[in-house]
Amino acid sequence: MKHTFVLFLSLILLVLPGCSAEKSSADTAKKTLTIYSTMSTDSERDTFRKLAAAFEKEHSDIHVSLHFPGNDYENMMRVRMAANDLPDLFDTHGWGKIRYGEYTADLRDMKWTQDLDPNLNSILKNKSGKVYAYPINQAKDGLAYNRNILDRYGIAPPETMDDFIKALRTIKEKSKGSIVPFWFAGYDKSSFAQYYDQFATPLLITDPAHNEKKQLINGTFQWSKFTYLSEILKQMQKEKLINIDAVTAKKSQLIELMAQNKIAFTMQGGTLGQDVAQINPNVKVGIIPTPAIHPGDDPIWIGGERYTLAAWKDSPQLKEAKDFIAFMARPANAKQMAEATSLPSGLTNVKADIFYANDYEYYQDVKVEPYFDRLYLPNGMWDVLGTVGQELAADILAPQDISQKLGREYKRLREQSETQGAENNE
């Protein structure tokens, strides 16, 4: 009996390695497609995961490995670029041509490129026709505002900086200080960087009489011409037109404060409107284009791609990477992602039902200008813009000091950067 049991156990042990090897072999046969994205909200990530799972069902030989590094994304990608070991697919977050261009596969032969929104051509294509990335959505940044407050005080959505300042003063006066006219989440310096970057375009680009494009490109721009934006921001702070805790306020506070009708304007877009509506459906959040600064100029959207999928040109799974992009570009899938991010699709054949759809339709004839830093500033200047904004609000630097610092950093970063934002028209 004992002999029989030992023999049986031996047979089991002989069979198990075979089963294990068979399973291991099946797993090994699957190709892993690694994807890195800058998506930040749960709704965005959940929808992306859902679509990735659907792709896996159609491609049983492929496993999709999604990664959302958050604030570590850029540093992680810099390390991987230095090692020439990029993910199979990755998010170019506005730097498809400038920073990642030499690493990306050309997608021009893919079917969806026929429906690429022309507003994205200057950002995602070069003169020879190379397409650097697939735009999951596109940004149209302006000013988010509380419709209830503007209606209550009889204020029309401002179209110029002068009108904007007047609106802020009216809100402060009529609310007796109970409402923050213009709210910043300055604990995250990107809040101030967004202000500078967004208003730099109407200040220095769109008005023909004040066009500094050539000077910004060739490095001769006089940064004293940038001082206006710091002066206006400081003026707003002195008049208490922005929140007194602008340097320490966090983004996590925004939704609740807006839902309580305590904020009139902010520069946060994305899912803000729908997030506020979930807390307080009676609060109506809208979005308007960035006001003009110079007399006679028009408001503009500041935009470009928000989330993208670029394929690493040296990826051993390049075919599979393109298959995934083609899957994401199907109209039904592209619509899902656009709606999850509450932004328009990057494709003209996709009409998404997003929160700000009526606003975008109302302002459909307003021109979209690319993000200022992506075209005219060297890599690294975004962080500098955010830092000087914090220093201005904390009374560490005066407006003129900020312009001098920006000039020094602009020169330094141009010299150390191999490619400049202004030199991306290859």
From Swiss-Prot:
Cross-referenced Pfam families: SBP_bac_1
Compartments where located: Cell membrane
Cross-referenced SUPFAM superfamilies: Periplasmic binding protein-like II
InterPro entries per record: Bact_solute-bd_prot1, SBP
Signal sequence residues: 1-18
Mode of membrane association: Lipid-anchor
Keyword Transport in record: yes
Main location: membrane
Induction annotation: Repressed by the transcriptional regulator MelR. Induced by melibiose and raffinose.
Any Gene Ontology biological process: polysaccharide transport
Lipidation (N-palmitoyl cysteine): 19
Lipid-linked residues (S-diacylglycerol cysteine): 19
Domain of life of the source: Bacteria
Keyword Flavoprotein in annotation: no
Keywords noted in UniProt: Cell membrane, Lipoprotein, Membrane, Palmitate, Polysaccharide transport, Signal, Sugar transport, Transport
Subunit structure: The complex is composed of two ATP-binding proteins (MsmX), two transmembrane proteins (MelC and MelD) and a solute-binding protein (MelE).
Family, as annotated: Belongs to the bacterial solute-binding protein 1 family.
Name of the protein in question: Melibiose/raffinose/stachyose-binding protein MelE
Lineage: Bacteria, Bacillati, Bacillota, Bacilli, Bacillales
Gene: melE
